[in-house]
Amino acid sequence: ILADLHQTALGAGTLAAVWAAEGPQATLCYDEETGTVSGAKPWCSGAGLVDVALVTARCGDGSRLVCLLTDAPGVLLQPQSWHATGMRGIPSGTVQFDQVRAEPVGAPGAYLARPGFWHGGAGIAACWYGAAVALAAPLQRSPRVEDDAQAAALLGQVDMALQSSAALLRELAAWIDAMP
């Protein structure tokens, strides 16, 4: 991410996280005049474990990526309320920020505009697709499908969704290959 945005790399041994998930609970704002962030950021995986976080925050020009030290004054880890099943053992909760010093990373909107963002999103979509295929497998193997019209209809819906998703992922992969 830092290389995509023409920023200096973090020091060797620095453990970093990217907290860019948004939702109604996300109230984090960057104040350009003071160079600080304030508000809440949900779904911060690795909170309490990492040294540095790259965090998306709202600002006057939309959204902006900032870099901050996670042990800075004003950083408060909320009790974990969300348990990321795929990352058991990694704390993932809301972090509250109160006028925490933050350095802008790139221009406003640059995090979402960089090519690597869409490449990463495609990888996540492929993972979700793989999970959907695995979830559909028992239905596809079920002997009920032969004798149960409703089960056969549901399997047809599942197959259509999986096939259209696969087609979109192939199209996305071709676009990424053409636009690295």
What would you call each of these model-derived segments?
Residues 166-180:
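C-terminal helix-coil-helix/basic helical segment that borders enzyme active sites and/or dimer interfaces
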Residues 1-5, 133-141, 174:
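Short glycine/serine- and small hydrophobic-enriched flexible loop segments
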Residues 34-38, 77, 95-99:
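Generic recognition of long tandem-repeat/solenoid scaffolds
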Residues 14, 24, 49-51, 62, ...:
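A generic structural signal for well-ordered coil/turn residues at beta-strand boundaries
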Residues 43-77:
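A short core secondary-structure module
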Residues 84-166:
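Glycine-rich beta->alpha junctions and the first turn(s) of the following alpha-helix
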Residues 18-20, 38, 55-56, 67-71, ...:
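Short beta-strand segments
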Residues 1-49:
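Glycine-rich flavin
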